[in-house]
């Protein structure tokens, strides 16, 4: 499945504005590059792409800008003359505007600052892609990893169990008052027990989920019913890694995978009646003129298994890991795009595809998790992925055409009505707790509505 071309019939100039987090390298950078390419190839000449990307510091903003402008120039050079935009108004073509902005999803004051800046501009966001995140690993169990590579390569690289998690990672204090109180304690030699403690926030949970969740709420004034909120998940978003009693993954044996399971639960249940109250609270939508206001839609995607720096390997081990990933693809694994650009296809598909291709498809066949899959020779496409408890489309036993039914997690169980009901119950509870956490932290940050 690829992004369809839109008609050239509409001549009124319009701007498609998309925000991508964590774009300085890896998947985030690849998503930005692919957005540029597919926008220029599929959208009419009357449309302009305003690509907003985030990084955590000014140097990365500048470096990413250079990379993206170089990519844009390369793409323009390859385009046929009829698709090549005029260069009279802006370097690199007037159909693409590239802008970098700062945010650190693990620092809530920067999340609020970003939202304040964008809302102040009043420019609608057509899509956001929540990609930024951290792994929370502290090393590799090399013996276990090598044994898995030698005996079960495809499975070991699709559902790895050899990364050593750093259990219990806690984010730095978020409120200025708490930070200044701690400083005053040091200066005045006051007993730390007299300083009110700030509730802990799981570092991985904050960077991967909650920072984006709050940003979604703060940016809600810029969303229209046609806007799209695209979450990036993982093939490793599996039930054993998540416990609803440990929402933030502070006790989880794999906080990264736990955070991605949270992502799946949030997105897949976002259109159910049981979560409607909480979703409307997040998006600030109630009733308008006696009618329930329409909401932007949430989508969830995953890039398959790609080679990025998130694992923190040195160059030597990184090379052999790359060899292993390609070998897994050559052994017919469907989930090894390897190249981040190929892995970006699912996120870009969810951001750019016309309404009749994606929204209507989910309305007919059910809500799905869209993954980046490849053939043996690397030809990439977008396909539905099974989500434990939800299935492929929210209907037990139904597998829509084009879904990937190989490379499955070995702990899976066949879909059932009970499993589907349990997934919804867990999702509704998760939404309730996320909304409670959001309101708590808005109060702590002095941002209550």
Predicted regions and their residues:
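Amphipathic alpha-helical repeat scaffolds
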Residues: 24, 131, 205-208
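Active-site loop of short-chain dehydrogenase/reductase
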Residues: 125, 165-184, 201, 222-235, ...
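NAD(P)H-dependent oxidoreductase Rossmann-fold/reductase module
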Residues: 1-107, 113, 117-126, 135, ...
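Amphipathic alpha-helical dimer-interface segment in Rossmann-like NAD(P)H-dependent oxidoreductases
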Residues: 207-227, 271-272, 276
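A short helix-coil junction within the Rossmann-fold of NAD(P)-dependent oxidoreductases
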Residues: 122, 135-139, 218-226
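Substrate-binding pocket helix/loop in short-chain dehydrogenase/reductase
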Residues: 140, 200-201
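Glycine-rich NAD(P)-binding loop of the Rossmann-fold in SDR/ketoreductase-type enzymes
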Residues: 106, 203-211, 258
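Conserved NAD(P)H cofactor-binding loop of Rossmann-fold oxidoreductase domains
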Residues: 131-189
């Amino acid at each position: 499945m690829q992004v369809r071309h839109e008609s050239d019939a509409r001549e009124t100039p319009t701007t498609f504005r998309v925000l991508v987090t964590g774009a300085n390298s890896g998947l985030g950078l690849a998503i930005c590059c692919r957005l540029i390419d597919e926008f220029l190839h599929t959208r009419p000449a009357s449309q302009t792409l305003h690509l907003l990307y985030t990084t955590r510091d000014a140097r990365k903003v500048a470096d990413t800008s250079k990379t993206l402008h170089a990519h844009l120039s390369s793409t323009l050079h390859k385009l046929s003359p009829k698709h090549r935009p005029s260069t009279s108004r802006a370097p690199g073509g007037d159909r693409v505007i590239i802008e970098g902005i700062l945010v650190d999803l693990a620092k809530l004051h920067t999340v609020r600052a970003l939202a304040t800046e964008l809302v102040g501009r009043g420019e609608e966001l057509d899509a956001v892609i929540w990609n930024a995140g951290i792994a929370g690993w502290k090393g590799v169990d090399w013996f276990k990893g090598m044994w898995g590579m030698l005996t079960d390569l495809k499975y070991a690289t699709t559902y790895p169990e050899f990364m050593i998690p750093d259990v219990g990672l806690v984010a730095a204090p978020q409120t200025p008052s708490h930070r200044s109180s701690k400083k005053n304690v040091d200066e005045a030699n006051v007993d730390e027990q007299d300083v009110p403690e700030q509730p802990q926030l799981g570092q991985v949970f904050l960077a991967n989920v909650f920072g984006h969740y709050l940003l979604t709420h703060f940016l809600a004034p810029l969303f229209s019913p046609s806007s799209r909120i695209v979450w990036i998940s993982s093939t490793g978003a599996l039930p054993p890694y998540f416990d609803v009693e440990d929402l933030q993954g502070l006790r989880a044996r794999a906080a990264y995978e736990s955070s991605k399971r949270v992502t799946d639960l949030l997105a897949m249940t976002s259109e159910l009646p049981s979560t409607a109250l909480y979703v409307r609270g997040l998006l600030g939508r109630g009733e308008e003129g006696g009618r329930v206001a329409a909401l932007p839609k949430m989508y969830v995607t995953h890039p398959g298994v790609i080679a990025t720096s998130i694992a923190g390997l040195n160059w030597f081990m990184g090379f052999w890991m790359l060899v292993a990933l390609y070998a897994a693809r050559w052994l017919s694994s469907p989930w090894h795009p390897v190249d981040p650009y190929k892995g970006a296809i699912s996120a870009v598909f969810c951001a750019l595809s016309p309404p009749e291709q994606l929204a209507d498809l989910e309305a007919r066949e059910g809500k799905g998790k869209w993954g980046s899959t490849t053939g043996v020779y690397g030809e990439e496409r977008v396909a539905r992925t099974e989500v434990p408890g939800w299935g492929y489309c929210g209907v037990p036993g139904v597998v829509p055409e084009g879904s990937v039914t190989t490379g499955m997690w070995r702990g899976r169980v066949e879909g059932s009505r009970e499993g589907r009901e349990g997934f919804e119950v867990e999702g509704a509870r998760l939404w309730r707790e996320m909304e409670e956490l959001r309101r708590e932290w808005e109060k702590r940050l002095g941002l209550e509505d």
